[in-house]
Structure formats: C-alpha cells, structure tokens
Amino acid sequence: MLIHIPSVLTVEEVAHCRQIMAGAEWVDGRVTAGPQSAMVKNNLQIPLSSDAHREMRDIVLRALGRNPTYNSAALPLRVVPPLFNRYDAGMSFAAHVDNAIRPIHETGARVRTDLSSTLFLSEPDEYDGGELVLHEPGSTQELKLPAGDMVLYPTTALHSVNEVTRGSRLASFFWTQSMIADEARRRIMFELDRTIMDLRTRLPDDDLAVLNLTNCYHNLMRQWCVL
C-alpha cells in the first residue's frame, strides 16, 4: 500500500529546513547503509551528531505527530529519527533492500522497519531525474512529489533513486515500526478508519452505525496490535 500524503510540512517548515541544509555539513551517505546497499549508494547526508540534524529531525517528528493520515496508515509504535540526504548531478541509488532492523542512533534501541517514508524537500522543477522508483513484480512506479509532501510505502518493496541529471534533490527519509506488522491488516485498519471518518461527516457521532463501526475498529486494534 503506497500512500501519498500532501503537505506534511508547511511551506514555512520546508523553507526553514532548506535554510538549515544550505549551511549544514554533508558527509558520504554510505555511512548509514548496509554492506549491500553501500555498493550502490551515491549521495550525501547530514551527520546524525550535528545540530542541523537534530533541529530538522524534531521539525519532522512534530509534523508526523500532527498528521492524521500518517498516524492512521502507519499506526506507528516507533520511528527511526528522520535522516536528511542530498543527490547532486550524477548521484543515484540503485535498486536495494532496506535493513529489516535498524538502530536508533542516540539510544541504541532497535526498530523493525515495517514502513519507509520519503519526505521531499525540493520542488520537482528544481532538479531533473531523482525519481523514487518502487519495483514491484512486473511493474515499476516512479514518484517525484512537491516539497513538503511525503510517500509512505512498505519497506519490503525493492526501491531505487534515479540519477539526478540537473540540480539537487533534497529529502528526508525514515522508517516506522507499526503496532501492526502485517501489511494486509494495516490496510484493513486504514480503510476502516477512513470509512468511519467519512460516515461521521454524514451522521452524528452518537449514531448507532458510527458507534458500532468504531467499536469494531477498536476491537480489531486490541486483537492485532503488539506493543
């Protein structure tokens, strides 16, 4: 289930992150890659220990906390603190698999990567190439979203970033451990939540149909969530 979530960051938040990135230190992006991914990864990242990273990390985490679509679709239990990268002309990231388990840099805790997110920080017309490509059996899907928009997709998907041929592509990326590991069950919960929200626009909250469907949602959460 791939979900495009518009305006995760406000225009002002994007501009502030861009300003921070303009003055930040950048290092080889392979520092956070596994052995296989490191062989095909060619980009730059902001160091995890830097003040720039910490400030932007907090901006993104606050934005995720207030975004109902992300919280409904991901049902997040833990989030690997967002990372920030840059692809200049000639840089790319060939098809690769993300690690199933990732550490949290500051605490050493480990997170199971159920969902991957890319939060775009450059406008599509600022660079050529640089599309995020999801490789599914028999098909591929390319994404290049407006600054502030995010794509959420299962970490099980093979994916790549096309070579940038002009300009620079700025983005944040991170992983989420969901309270529900199974993708099919997460989809059911997301669709059920959206149905309840739609029903509430047409019926009062104390309507029996709304109450019964909401009760079903929470009973499924009790059955399927692992905390």
Swiss-Prot record:
GO terms for molecular function: 2-oxoglutarate-dependent dioxygenase activity; iron ion binding; L-ascorbic acid binding. Binds 1 Fe(2+) ion per subunit. GO terms for biological process: DNA damage response; intracellular iron ion homeostasis. 2-oxoglutarate binds at R169. Fe cation binds at H96, D98, H159. Residues 78-178 form the Fe2OG dioxygenase domain. The keyword Lyase does not apply. Keywords: Dioxygenase, Iron, Metal-binding, Oxidoreductase, Vitamin C. Its cofactor is Fe(2+); L-ascorbate. Its EC number is 1.14.11.-. Disulfide bonds: none annotated. InterPro entries: Oxoglu/Fe-dep_dioxygenase_dom (IPR005123), PKHD_C (IPR041097), PKHD_hydroxylase (IPR023550), Pro_4_hyd_alph (IPR006620), Pro_4_hyd_alph_FE2OG_OXY (IPR044862). It comes from the Bacteria. PANTHER family: PKHD-TYPE HYDROXYLASE YBIX. This is PKHD-type hydroxylase GDI1238/Gdia_1949. It comes from Gluconacetobacter diazotrophicus (strain ATCC 49037 / DSM 5601 / CCUG 37298 / CIP 103539 / LMG 7603 / PAl5).
